[in-house]
Amino acid sequence: MIKTTLLFFATALCEIIGCFLPWLWLKRNASIWLLLPAGISLALFVWLLTLHPAASGRVYAAYGGVYVCTALMWLRVVDGVKLSLYDWTGALIALCGMLIIVAGWGRT
């Protein structure tokens, strides 16, 4: 379960970086060359999704919970925004949902 969770976090980080770099280019007039590492990051994101040992729909559903938590960590660390009680509560609920889905892998 820990390996799967860490793989989900790595997957989410690749997706967020792959989307953040074009955002920098479009919204903050950063270099167009950021699109190259963005594309690589998104390709890595897709590849990482294939490493999960479950049907794609379950992987995507469980991944959503981890993505929420990773995005909130990004909000805190990169954007410098203090997380609210609602952020923490939502992240906990999303993570619990992910754990329930992953716990059922192989049992259905």
From Swiss-Prot:
Superkingdom in the source lineage: Bacteria
Annotated membrane topology: Multi-pass membrane protein
Periplasmic side: 1-5, 52-60, 106-108
UniProt keywords, alphabetically: Cell inner membrane, Cell membrane, Membrane, Transmembrane, Transmembrane helix
InterPro entries according to UniProt: UPF0060 (IPR003844)
Chief subcellular location: membrane
Regions that span the bilayer: 6-26, 31-51, 61-81, 85-105
Keyword Membrane: yes
Pfam families: UPF0060
Keyword Cell inner membrane tagged: yes
GO terms under cellular component: plasma membrane
Disulfide bond annotation, renumbered to this chain: none
Cytoplasmic side: 27-30, 82-84
Family: Belongs to the UPF0060 family.
Protein name (record): UPF0060 membrane protein YnfA
